[in-house]
From Swiss-Prot:
Cellular component GO terms, alphabetical: cytoplasm
GO molecular function: magnesium ion binding; phosphoribosyl-AMP cyclohydrolase activity; zinc ion binding
Catalytic reactions on record: 1-(5-phospho-beta-D-ribosyl)-5'-AMP + H2O = 1-(5-phospho-beta-D-ribosyl)-5-[(5-phospho-beta-D-ribosylamino)methylideneamino]imidazole-4-carboxamide
Gene name of the encoded protein: hisI
Chain residues that bind Mg(2+): 78, 80, 82
Keywords: Amino-acid biosynthesis, Cytoplasm, Histidine biosynthesis, Hydrolase, Magnesium, Metal-binding, Zinc
Protein's name in the database: Phosphoribosyl-AMP cyclohydrolase
Length: 134
């Protein structure tokens, strides 16, 4: 059966679309990733976020190693049809591989000459504990 809805997405030259992941309820931006057609289809089928890992060159089911899956509540396409927004519930409140709630834990503070990036979110769990394989 043809999945015509996938054709509405404007995939880039590599067959990818940028994805913003936002926490349902708080509206916190948790992370940014990419999807290909298969990842978006699997996300819809599973009800959990599946991305395309550009470094591993394979589908990446978020939480497959850590258990920190993202339950998808809503999928939106932006006005240009070239960015996807996932509204999710983040299992165990950890979205970032650094053990933080959000991947956006560094905030610029200061001016153009003396400013710097400050860490503004705590580590909720040591990544060594998250990714230790039994």
């Amino acid at each position: 059966m043809a999945k015509k809805w996938l054709n509405k997405v404007k995939w880039d030259d590599n067959g990818l679309v940028p994805v913003i992941v936002q926490e349902a309820g708080s509206n916190d931006v948790l992370m940014f990733a990419f999807m290909n057609r298969d990842a978006l289809l699997r996300t819809v089928e599973l009800g959990e976020a599946v991305f395309w890992s550009r470094s591993r060159k394979r589908l990446w089911h978020k939480g497959e190693e850590s258990g920190h899956v993202q339950k998808v509540h809503e999928i939106r396409l932006d006005c240009d049809e070239d960015v996807v927004l996932l509204k999710v519930t983040q299992v165990d409140s950890i979205a970032c591989h650094t053990g933080r709630h959000s991947c956006f834990f560094q905030k610029f503070d200061g001016d153009a000459d003396t400013g710097d990036w400050q860490t503004v979110e705590p580590v909720l769990k040591d990544p060594a504990q998250i990714y230790t394989k039994p």
